[in-house]
Design a protein with these regions (language model features):
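Nucleotidyltransferase catalytic core that binds NTPs
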Residues: 1-383
């Protein structure tokens, strides 16, 4: 009996500020085959075609490798996907979301593989995009940093336009509220309960704008046991100790982001800030881990949230070996606010033009009684 063919699936992209929308696309792609190979573009390529990335290429390579559905990462993948690339990495076809990715010249980056019949589509996750997240962070300039050069009215309106739903915005990167469902969470969850003899490790935090610091911390925590449970604080708790407009992402967005990565076995949604005996007993926790690079504030009553596990002798501090923080990412955006405003605005203009062209093509195909997803888009680059 002949061996069953291993289907190798190719995905590629910038994967900047990796979020659960990226992960959901990769999850769907993995379901179409046996092995998922992900190509990640360089900083130079992204800057040329879209504007500067928030995360550098080494950070992006590392983050994509951490996603649970990814088998291999190809560093420095070309911006336009070619048949040659698919053949080079022994991939049968490539998968992309049902939005359009364009070069700096306004050409569909998947044109060649579409013509070759080696292109498949999956559903894009509505309600989240890197453009949207950048827009949310830009809005923090009004209250979070209290800059002396407060945004004037025109600048404020321009900034808000990057994070507000509007008919004039791209349907792919405009803000539409993410609507969580139990089905979505189940698709992301590991679905395996701990075995009777598993050493169960517990960590907790906000995990806002999930980044390389979070990933490094979870990887170190996972090494201490067999099953890692991650408690994720509610929006109210995060806002209580961080203030202003935090968290950037809602509780359910943060839950899906954490569940996307390999170290996570289970999450506690809306975990208590202080780790209680009840929590430890309920989840049969053997070790409670705290990272030593991020400050944890005491409760309102000035109580150490790790007091109970310390008394029980199950508390263990670990070094995440990475200094990145959510605030550091916000600072990257705010310190280069003008650059990212321009990048977001240009990206939306290009996508609006592409969307209109795609709709026109679909209407023409319907009028001729045909359908399909292998249309090739080419538009003029909007200035």
């Amino acid at each position: 009996m002949a061996e069953e063919k291993i289907v190798r699936v190719w995905c590629d992209g910038c994967y900047d500020m990796v979020h659960f929308g990226h992960a959901n696309q990769l999850r769907q792609a993995k379901q179409m085959g046996n092995k998922l190979i992900v190509g990640v573009h360089t900083d130079e390529e992204i800057t040329k075609h879209k504007g500067p990335p928030v995360f550098n290429e080494q950070e992006r390579y590392r983050m994509v490798r951490g996603i649970k559905w990814v088998d291999e990462v190809v560093e420095g993948a070309p911006y336009s996907t070619t048949v040659k690339t698919l053949d080079q990495y022994n991939c049968d076809f490539c998968v992309h979301g049902n939005d359009i990715t364009l070069t700096a010249d306004g050409i569909d980056t998947y044109a060649e593989v579409k013509k070759a019949g080696r292109y498949k589509e999956c559903e894009r996750t509505a309600g989240v995009s890197t453009t949207d997240l950048v827009g949310r962070m830009l809005l923090l300039t009004r209250s979070h940093h209290n800059l002396n050069d407060e945004l004037d009215l025109v600048s404020r309106e321009r900034t808000e336009s990057l994070s507000t739903d509007s008919d004039s915005h791209s349907p792919w990167t405009r803000v539409s509220r993410f609507l969580p469902s139990t089905q979505t969470i189940m698709q992301f969850a590991e679905g395996r309960p701990p075995a009777p003899n598993d050493i169960i490790v517990y960590v907790c935090g906000s995990f806002d704008l999930f980044h390389i610091g979070h990933l490094s911390f979870l990887e170190e925590a996972r090494k201490l046991g067999d099953y890692l449970i991650i408690g994720i604080y509610s929006d109210n708790i995060v806002n209580e100790y961080k203030g202003n407009n935090y968290p950037i992402m809602s509780l359910h967005e943060r839950v899906l982001s954490v569940l996307s990565f390999k170290p996570a076995s289970e999450v506690v949604i809306g975990a208590p800030y202080s780790i209680t005996q009840e929590l430890i007993d309920r989840f049969r926790i053997n070790i409670v881990v705290q990272g030593n690079r991020v400050q944890h504030h005491p409760t309102i009553d000035d109580i150490d949230p790790y007091e109970v596990p310390k008394q029980l002798g199950i508390y263990k501090p670990v070094d995440s070996k990475n200094d990145e923080t959510t605030e550091g990412i916000v600072d990257r955006i705010i310190n280069h606010r003008r650059v990212f405003e321009k990048r977001n605005a240009k990206k939306e203009k290009k996508e609006i033009a592409a969307y209109k062209a795609l709709q026109k093509l679909k209407e023409e195909k319907c009028s001729h009684g045909s359908s399909g997803t292998n249309e090739v888009i080419c538009i003029e680059d909007p200035k």
